Amino acid sequence: MSKRYLIRTNISPFDNPTYYDAVRKNVVRSNSGNLLFPHSLIRALMTDDDTVFDPVNTHGSFSDEEIDRINASYDAFLIPLANAFRISFMEELANLTALVRRLTISCIVVGIGFQGNLSGDISRGFKWADTARDFCKAVLEKSAKIGLRGETTAKFMDYLGFQRDKDYQVIGCPSMFLYGADLPAPKPLSLSPDIRIHINSKVDLPQKLHDYLKGVCDAIPDHYYLPQNQYELVAMYTGIPLSYTRPDLKTMPAHYPTDPSHPLFRQNRIRGFVTVPSWLDFLRQGDLNFGTRIHGNIAAILAGIPAFIIAPDSRVLELAEYHRIPHTTVADLDEKTSVFDLLENVDFNSVLDGHKERFETYLQFLCDNDLPSIYHAMDASAKSANNEEDTSHSATTNHKDDASHSATGNRQENTPTTSTSCPFDKKISEIDFRPPLVPYRHLAASDHFDAMRFRYTFLAKRMIKGVLRKA
């Protein structure tokens, strides 16, 4: 019987929303990176065409009727998370704890992380430690282990009183295992001003970083900026300056694309993403990915593009270290070093080192939590084939036929092949995903009306909030 999963995400990988719906409904959960790890997890667990993955938003509370329906309808509740151990997420984490406690089905956390400064210091006290501890206890009553993003989070779990291997396992980010043990080798890079570079960052980072990225753009004319935050997608789609979509920021950094007058807006060199396939397709057109966003750079790695991260905090750093993604930190960045000198001796193939072993750890985590995957099914199929035809030629042929989701080896091509024998890939291949979002003034004429409609609705709501605050 096919499995039925409830999964914490705002959008299914098979959804193809209009720009209007994507921005209005915040399908990226405030950050496009949140699309990537559910996408990968669903691919792994979709063992047949009838496997069900229903998205759920966990921001609010659930009625008794909703809880009864979930318990009766699903085999497990999948909770792929990012930097959930942070103070600004504690309210939703408490909501999640309450939800998990009321469920009778399995509840599995895949890839949770701790957000702190670059030192990863967890020796100080945390006022919200009890909230985090309660969440972990609730989850461990419904699962075998909790999957962590990296070693800094492991230290935090130790601080909370949990034990490695017994209560948790470091598995990295599920997004890195989109193709299983296979990972595309980064395409060769010849550093020069003539390459095409894709840059990712965010507004609330030190000015020295924005200055450095401005220098990168000056040095490499063929550049694109790829924002990930919801407030930037709103600014792109509507033409409303970032100062309106992020009123909590008292000042805007110099050089950052904050409004339609910025050269990146005017020259149509900004792209936003609300589906993973359109994101990867766009990244494949570049030569280099560069910036501060962990999933923006993981997406490039999955697209077979060399990626380099400037880590601003522990949540990014621990994943870069675990998955051996080339990186430096904001603290270590020397503004006087050109991007060409910075990257001159970087080994972009380091992401391949140990990837198979990391995947096997991830696969074991899925096994420990009784989550059957396409990789388990494939292993069973391979064993059956070997029993029927006990020849090395037959085994090699079967391995090649299923290369897109083989459980062994690293791919040596730039773009991994997908296979229609994989239910997820087959379903994705049938969808004509919309291209990336472009700045307001460059939208197709057919999209302008909806963009204008959203613009005036957004401004009206902001105006009403301002009046109510003054009252």
Question: Which ranges hold each PLM region?
Answer:
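Active-site anion-handling motifs in enzyme catalytic cores
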Residues: 1-393, 398, 403, 408-470
